[in-house]
Swiss-Prot record:
Full protein name: Cobyric acid synthase
Pathway stated in the Swiss-Prot or TrEMBL entry: Cofactor biosynthesis; adenosylcobalamin biosynthesis
Function of the molecule: Catalyzes amidations at positions B, D, E, and G on adenosylcobyrinic A,C-diamide. NH(2) groups are provided by glutamine, and one molecule of ATP is hydrogenolyzed for each amidation.
Family assignment from sequence similarity: Belongs to the CobB/CobQ family. CobQ subfamily.
UniProtKB keywords: Cobalamin biosynthesis, Glutamine amidotransferase
Segments passing through the bilayer: none
Species name: Rippkaea orientalis (strain PCC 8801 / RF-1)
GO MF annotation terms: ABC-type vitamin B12 transporter activity; catalytic activity
Amino acid sequence: MKAIMVVGTTSHAGKSFITTAICRILARQGWHVTPFKGQNMALNAYVTPTGGEIGHAQAVQAWAAKITPSVDMNPILLKPQGNMTSQVIIHGQAVGTTSAQEYYEQYFDRGWKAITSSLDCLASEYDVVVCEGAGSPAEINLKHRDLTNMRVAHHLNAATILVVDIDRGGAFAHVVGTLQLLEPEEKALIKGIVINKFRGQRSLLDSGIEWLENYTSIPVLGVIPWREIMFPSEDSLGLLDRPSYRSTTSLKISILRLPHISNFTDFDPLDAETTVNLNYLDLRGTLGYPDAVIIPGSKTTIADLIALHTTGMAQQLQDYVSAGGVILGICGGFQMLGQTVFDPDQLEGGQKAYKGLNLLPLETIITSNKIVRQRQIMSNYPYSGLPVTGYEIHQGITQLIQSYETEQTILLDQLFDDISLGFVNESQTIWGCYLHGLFDNGAWRRSWLNYLRQRRGLPSLPTGIANYREQREANLDAIADLVEEFVNLKPVFPK
């Protein structure tokens, strides 16, 4: 099996982007190619058809390669959950929660075995594996326990690309410093350098590139210009780079930027809608009166629920609802909508019960049992009979409170044909569900947006549209076209 490795001088250099592009380019050339990331730390996750959990970026890369995502493409997934701890997922299954120090003491050998086992499985099925590193391969305090970068490249004898983000400045120093900190046998694997996110006149780089090639004896394979192509970010730091409302188009939807926000790739399909403006709102910000507010998934529901209360955002949400606003909670956000979140085993906090937002007559019980599965269901709202697919990733069950006394009776109906997946209130202003990937469903997404548009007196949009995967396919081709145009990949490609 031919191996290609993509490492970066820093986080957010463009490793995922270029790995994805290479997968699509090779797939278009007829190669049977697979992505691979030995260990990924991310809160954006995807559920494979077998019920295993992997990083969402590896699922996107699998789609770029025109194959079905599998747990072998990301054998280790670490999901940060606060207090300097992470949930450890090996081959798709949660195996424990640990601190960084405990992880390397308890899971390093097991992790490397999982990585090599997955590589063996992929080697038996694919012609080419395109591996993605993590962070930097030259973190000298971490190299001895780095499971993701040059250890994998050396194991596979992979032709390796070093990517640098020039937009943040210091690109030449980053490249030289990274190469100087690699061992000679590691540096020998680097077959080329890619300069990413360049803005400006290309010729201004010529003298710098000539110097860099002479100094390092490694060719610069290309310079990728900055392009506004929709590509999912791996962690919430990417949300800081997003603009707020970018124009004055029809609908304004605010997504709360929870401290432990997860699976915010759920909202890429909304971002692709030209009539929608998304705003990721800090909890200390002013909510105002957008057309809808979304409370997204959370890796640590209780901590983020507490943050809603302590920042005053919970009160802003109450005022917003009283004024007729629309709220949608997904997964952890759904759990927060109820009256109480119970944590009997204190899995997330020091108490056994926490006050919810009290917007729906529901209660959630956090459990150690983790539900991870794909779903195919039918909708009841905003219209009945719409086919919906997605996936669940959550710990806990949410149920109606049997005896709920309030000044005004709140009537609920189930959102889908499976009552366990979500509810909507009678006025259709409070929506909650466990389903990730909900907005990938084109007809459901447009129907929900049309409901918001009708509230504003705006004309409806066509609902007979394809699911988001067709838009995603176009984006993947655009990414591949960009890299293919500006990067010479022949030195690392299979012959």
